[in-house]
Amino acid sequence: PVGIGISHARETLYIDLDSQSQETLDVLKEFLLSPNYNFIGHNIFFDGAILQAQLGQWMNWTACTYGLFRQLANEGWVGQKYGLKQAQLDLLGWDTRGDVELDEWLVAAGVVKNYEHVFSKWSAEERLADFRAGGSIRVDKSRMSLAPPNILGYYCGLDAYSTYKLYTEVLLPAIHRLPAKFQEVFTWYHSLFITNVELLVQQQLRGVYVDVGQLSQFETKTRILIDDYSGQFRRHPEV
C-alpha cells in the first residue's frame, strides 16, 4: 500500500507511507498489530490480505462493514451494490461519492482504460467533459496510486471516515434494533464470520484460492431456492 487511512470518533488521518521515517513506520506497525485496538474495514478480505502481506500478521479486525451491509440487507435485490461508495449515498445520505475528486484527477492525467488505443489524442479537458457527462471514459482505479498524496489521501480519509460512520451510525444501531434472538447471532459474529475471512486470507496468501466459479453457481442455485420459497410463502392462503 502507498498509504493508510485511519478514523475514529474524534479525527481522521491519512498516512503517506513513502514520506515517513523508519521510526514512524515502526510505531505505525506496532499500533496496527496491537491487540488493544479494534479495527473495522469495508471488505476486510481485501484490506486484511494486503496488510497481512505487509505486516506479516493478521490485525485485530472486529467487523467488516461490507459483510454487515450484505448480511443485514434481508430485502436486498439482484444486482444491488454493497460497495462503500454506494453506501455513502444510500445509507449515509451523502450528495456525492467520496471518490469524485480522485476520479477526475485520474481522468485528467490520462489514467483511464483504453488510453493508448482511444483516448490518448483527447485533451484533459475533453476527457473530463466526457467523464462528467457519463460518456465512454472509464477510470483505471487499479493505478490510482499514481495520484499525489493530497488527492489520494483525501479520498482514502473519506473512505476511512465513512466506514467508521457506517458502522457506528447505521449498522450497529440496526443490529441493536433486532429482536433479542437475532442479536444473539451477532455475539458470535467474530467466531462465525471474521475468523472465516482470516482463514480465506491465510489460504490465499499460500496459494489456495476460492473456486469463484463454483461459488457463483452455488449463489445462483441458492437465489433460485430463496425466490421459490419466498413465492410459496407469499401465496400461502394464511399469509
Question: What would you call each of these model-derived segments?
Answer:
Residues 2-178, 200:
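Active-site-proximal helix-loop-helix substrate-binding element of RNase H-like nuclease domains
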